[in-house]
Amino acid sequence: MMTQANAYFYDGADVALLNGQYTDVFSLLGMHSANEGKALIVRCFLRNALSVDVISIKDGRKVASLDKVNEQGLFAGTLGRRVKPFLYLLRVEYPLCQLDIVDPYQFDSLLNSDDIYLFGEGSAERAYEFLGANWRQTQGVEGVHFCVWAPNAKRVSVVGDFNHWDDTRHVMRQHLANGLWELFLPNVVEGAHYKFDLVYQNGERHTKSDPMATQMECAPHNASIVPPKAHHSWNDTAWMSKRAATAWHKAPMSAYEVHLGSWRRKGEQGEQYLDYQDLIEQLIPYVKEQGFTHIELMPISEFPFDGSWGYQPVGLYAPTHRFGDANGLKAFVDACHQAGIGIILDWVSAHFPKDPHGLVRFDGTCLYEHEDPRKGTHPDWDTLIYNYDRGEVRSFLLSNACYWLREFHFDGLRLDAVSSMLYLDYSREPGQWLPNAYGGRENLEAISFLQILNQRLYQAFPGICMIAEESTAFAGVTKPTDQQGLGFGFKWNMGWMNDSLSYLGRDPLYRQFHHHQLTFSLMYAYTEQFMLSVSHDEVVHGKGSLLHKIPGDDWQKFATLRAYYGFMWGHPGKKLLFMGCEFGQRNEWNHNQSLDWHLLAYEPHQGVQRWLKDLNQLYQDMPALSVQDYEGAGFSWLDCENSRDSIFTFVRYGLAGDAPLVFVINMTPQLHTGFRIGLPLAGDYREYLNSDSQIYGGSNQGNAGTVVAESLPWQGMAQSALITVPPLGCLVIGPATGLAEAN
């Protein structure tokens, strides 16, 4: 019933509204029928207002002046003879100004039932188009549609610099059935700062960043930012068509892993990041010159702590502010594509940090994470693990993956820490984890999510590459999902990386006793579609740079590094190398400063860089190095047992008509002359590459560019040749002209 003192509000509604305790605000505020449909009533809540008039948007005429219900800012009034709702604005007189405000409480819900269903089901691929802050137009009025998922909140408001961060000003519409809260706000400008203000069931109030924000403030501030209306105009049609037609498992793929904040810096003391335009002008030409086919970016979703390198993101949908805005990032990706360079994004779906403005206990409950810490917390990083069993969480992650691929044209995702997703007992002692429904250690919900993710992404985005960082022997990581695999395109070969780097750090005198560390990887090379990775993880935290790992004097260090790269580029599998490794960085990586580019003033570093460039060129020119990466017919040992000399010889084969390539790698400083190797074809051979050449900083021991096969069977081949094998060197030998008949 109405109170006698207040004819516009039901008993207690005005008090509840003033105290922020009235959640169904759309039933109260805005325009409503009154007096059994014979009149219209408008109610509004505007703190500090002196007077409020209702103005028709259609003709600009004043319809009514509202009564001031109380001094706290409640206004209400009937609209004379009008009975049909119409669009209006509120002309508000404040002590120092007058404002025209389009009343947000006159608009119906903008949510679509199909979107809501898919979001709850866990299959939404475009949730970012209705959640977060999106520019919309309804009934001819433009504004920002705010929407957030918080099913257990008692009340949610959008607060920002457009309402002086007043939590009672813009209380959102609640959808009880699905836990969504929404509000369409006209009079909001691009770049406005905002957050969501949530009242929990226990009465506590917390402000949170928008989980779907596409732009955020820089730390230590954490407001979300209304995005710009303008969008990037893409010019990469040719690349996207080529990508869709490329079978990457049969194509050359060498990725240059980049941390944008430390690849190179500017400013007198190197204190400034390069922005995206700088990166277009500097990074892209460098990668192109070095012959890499792809750039892999370490995470760029907004993260507050620089020392996390991006692996603890709070704004999963927001490109970090550090290098520019979203349109700048799109321009950078576009420029990569126009230069013929693919670009892969590191994507963190295994965990999220506990920053209070982030996802942790978002609505007062464990919404995105598991309630039980035995399943919901990550013991290694003190972070939280997503609840992959919850449909809305799956939609949040699936939509985010689609967001980067669809809106930014990334050519694939590299998923971080996949092993921690697959196992419930990952880094946990007995009693610290919960088994699955069958009593096992596999995280069945995470496995299902990864399968759905890969299946959906490969269907929606032709030619992308999905890459897993998975460090265990979990079976079927790169098997198709219809064969019960996880459905990734590639998996980092962590076993090869650990073994080969261990071998690299051994004294050449003792390498003969560890020969298997370079040969064992071929025992399992075809169980998955592997990518050989030497990533940022191998040159930090006291591990030292690659050059630092290698024993010996400088000459031996550089020669060994070149030979190692030769082995890596000859080994089956795609390639990934962290920035700085391509020129022999001496210091281990420091995310707070630029790479040591001054080292390129010295010939040994120039030599390593030139060697990598030539390896990449050969890799792209010779199909034998990629077309059968995942077929046993693409590789054959000539001799994998010469541990005494620490020499490795093998052949890489392409398809019919492709020239085979012979690799000879010597991992000791001993020069070998008159060394016989088997050859797959008769005729003259060319020394394509020799890491000991003077142009790479070597001692120039080799075969003067030519090797002649003779009809002497050796190492299972019908012909062979005597060659000179340089110390700590790599030779790549192939047919000089046309192909003779193979054995």
Swiss-Prot record:
Q: What is any one GO biological process for this UniProt entry?
A: glycogen biosynthetic process
Which Gene Ontology molecular-function terms are recorded?
A: 1,4-alpha-glucan branching enzyme activity; cation binding; hydrolase activity, hydrolyzing O-glycosyl compounds
Its EC number is: 2.4.1.18
Q: Which UniProt keywords apply?
A: Carbohydrate metabolism, Glycogen biosynthesis, Glycogen metabolism, Glycosyltransferase, Transferase
- Which ranges does the record mark as transmembrane? none
Alphabetized Gene3D superfamilies for the sequence: Glycosidases (3.20.20.80), Golgi alpha-mannosidase II (2.60.40.1180), Immunoglobulins (2.60.40.10)
Q: Does the keyword Glycosyltransferase apply?
A: yes
Q: Which residues form the active site?
A: 416, 469
- Gene Ontology cellular component list: cytosol
| CDD domains documented for this protein | AmyAc_Glg_BE (cd11322), E_set_GBE_prok_N (cd02855)
Q: Does the keyword Glycosyltransferase apply?
A: yes
A Pfam family per the record: CBM_48
| Pathway(s) it belongs to | Glycan biosynthesis; glycogen biosynthesis
Q: Which reaction is the catalytic activity of this chain? A: Transfers a segment of a (1->4)-alpha-D-glucan chain to a primary hydroxy group in a similar glucan chain
Q: Which family does the record claim for this protein?
A: Belongs to the glycosyl hydrolase 13 family. GlgB subfamily.
Sum up the protein's function in the record's words. Catalyzes the formation of the alpha-1,6-glucosidic linkages in glycogen by scission of a 1,4-alpha-linked oligosaccharide from growing alpha-1,4-glucan chains and the subsequent attachment of the oligosaccharide to the alpha-1,6 position.
Subunit architecture: Monomer.
How is this protein named in the record? Answer: 1,4-alpha-glucan branching enzyme GlgB
Naturally occurring in which organism (per UniProt): Shewanella baltica (strain OS195)
- Which gene holds the coding sequence for this protein? glgB
